[in-house]
Amino acid sequence: MSLDEFTQLTPDDLISSLDNFQQEIVRTLLKVTNGNYLEVADKWLSASPSNTAKFGGEINRSVLYREKVVDEIEKFLCGNDSTYEEERRKLNIQSDKSQKYIVGVMSTAIGGQLGVAGTFIAPVIVLLVISMGKMCINAWCEMRREIKTKTS
């Protein structure tokens, strides 16, 4: 499975790549928020101060922290930064990649950059990938470039 194929998976397929306890929490939060993936990501990031020490754990800051994760996902998927070059190379040469494997590689690498455990950040990564919709990686990366150009 390529990264582009990964981003095209259904929300249920992406959520099923998480550990069972994470799937249960994410699905419950999605019901409570009427399927708002970004709101669930924010709730996850503000879940508890002990889990989010590097982020601060404050609810009103969760959007800022979500944007940090989005920036890292952009670096990973778009390849516009050498930070994740080794991980992308491994994914390109690995022939049998499941969505669980891809989530594991992404969450470990991004979690390492942000100073949090990959297992903590994995649901946020999945929710943010789902929020991309069915947009292919190239289109999403181009959209992110345009947004950054307009805001700078």
Give residue ranges: language-model regions.
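Alpha-helical interaction segments
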Residues: T33-N34, F55, R66, I130
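N-terminal leader/propeptide segments of preproteins
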Residues: M1-A53
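Charged/polar, solvent-exposed surface patches and flexible loops
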Residues: Q8, S16, R27-K31, K43, ...
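Mature extracellular/secreted ectodomains of secretory-pathway proteins
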Residues: S46-I102
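Membrane-inserting effector segments that mediate pore formation, membrane fusion
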Residues: Y84-E142
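Cytosolic/matrix-facing juxtamembrane and C-terminal tails of multi-pass cellular membrane proteins
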Residues: E142-S152
